[in-house]
């Protein structure tokens, strides 16, 4: 039996085990998927240990994605992004990044074509970098903003994008076709709003990559009549891409989505 896992800190919230175990079962694979809490200083030990023990593959989540680049041999996408969320062991210890394609496919799933669209990307972490990289390839006109300007500037500089200070966020939202929250703001009760939701318009798309709950940002978007997209399908599509990397098989997307939505339904009862 092949063993797979997601590593992160915190990790208790992850729905990756539910999603991937459903996929393995649906495809008749002798495999199991687990979640392990790993801190950044032990990431190298964890990845090398997984390789030594014959793991089939790993996913990486907050805060490990950027640190992993120094441990793995990154593929072209992971190297360009500067972060890896997937590790394979078939041909050495390879790092991949499926977050960007996950976000791109999630937007397409809901009928959103970003080619030529003005996209405001809020955030500068590993997920934000992946989204910026992929949507730029998809033809979007991206402006990056972030509460910590140094990180936002670094992302924009690395990928050849425009950065604007977070203090301008209301004006940036007003002129954007698509607004993407790639931060953790909204994941917890009491989180402050990123901006005044009343400025949103019906013709806009609001994509919040948080999948564990309906955020205030998405509620504001729905009140405005805008298209509101949560992070569920990004989670599913990035997981599906990882599944294909590990197994070489067509991913059972419908099964993975159903498993995630069922788990979320239980969590939010």
Curated annotation (Swiss-Prot):
The keyword Acetylation does not apply. Pathway: Metabolic intermediate biosynthesis; chorismate biosynthesis; chorismate from D-erythrose 4-phosphate and phosphoenolpyruvate: step 4/7. It catalyses: shikimate + NADP(+) = 3-dehydroshikimate + NADPH + H(+). Pfam families: SDH_C, Shikimate_DH, Shikimate_dh_N. GO terms for biological process: amino acid biosynthetic process; aromatic amino acid family biosynthetic process; chorismate biosynthetic process; shikimate metabolic process. GO terms for molecular function: NADP binding; shikimate 3-dehydrogenase (NADP+) activity. The keyword Amino-acid biosynthesis applies. Its EC number is 1.1.1.25. NADP(+) binds at residues 76, 123-127, 146-151, 209, 231. Gene3D superfamilies: Leucine Dehydrogenase, chain A, domain 1, NAD(P)-binding Rossmann-like Domain. The active site is at residue 65. Keywords: Amino-acid biosynthesis, Aromatic amino acid biosynthesis, NADP, Oxidoreductase. It is an enzyme of class 1 (oxidoreductase). Shikimate binds at residues 14-16, 61, 85, 99, 211. Homodimer. Belongs to the shikimate dehydrogenase family. Involved in the biosynthesis of the chorismate, which leads to the biosynthesis of aromatic amino acids. Catalyzes the reversible NADPH linked reduction of 3-dehydroshikimate (DHSA) to yield shikimate (SA). PANTHER family: BIFUNCTIONAL 3-DEHYDROQUINATE DEHYDRATASE_SHIKIMATE DEHYDROGENASE, CHLOROPLASTIC, SHIKIMATE DEHYDROGENASE. This is Shikimate dehydrogenase (NADP(+)).
């Amino acid at each position: 039996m092949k063993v797979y896992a997601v590593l992160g800190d915190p990790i208790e919230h992850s729905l990756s085990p539910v999603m991937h175990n459903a996929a393995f079962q649906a495809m008749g694979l002798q495999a199991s998927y687990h979640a392990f809490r790993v801190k950044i200083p032990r990431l190298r030990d964890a990845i090398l240990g997984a390789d030594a023990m014959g793991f089939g593959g790993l996913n990486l989540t907050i805060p490990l994605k950027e640190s992993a680049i120094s441990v793995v041999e990154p593929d072209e996408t992971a190297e360009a992004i500067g972060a890896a969320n997937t590790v394979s062991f078939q041909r050495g210890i390879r790092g991949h990044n499926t977050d960007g394609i996950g976000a791109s496919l999630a937007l397409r799933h809901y009928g959103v074509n970003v080619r030529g669209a003005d996209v405001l990307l809020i955030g500068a972490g590993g997920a934000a970098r992946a989204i910026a990289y992929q949507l730029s390839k998809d033809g979007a006109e991206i402006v990056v903003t972030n509460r910590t300007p140094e990180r936002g500037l670094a992302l924009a500089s690395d990928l050849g994008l425009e950065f604007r200070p977070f203090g301008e966020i209301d004006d940036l939202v007003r002129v954007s076709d698509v607004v993407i929250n790639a931060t953790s703001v909204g994941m917890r009760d009491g989180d402050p709003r990123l901006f005044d939701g009343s400025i949103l318009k019906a013709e806009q798309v609001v994509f919040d990559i948080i999948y564990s709950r309906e955020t205030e940002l998405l509620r504001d978007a729905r009140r405005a009549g805008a298209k509101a997209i949560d992070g569920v399908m990004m989670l599913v599509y990035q997981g599906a891409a990882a599944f294909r990397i590990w197994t070489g098989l067509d991913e059972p997307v419908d099964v993975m989505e159903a498993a995630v939505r069922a788990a979320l339904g239980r969590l939010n009862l």
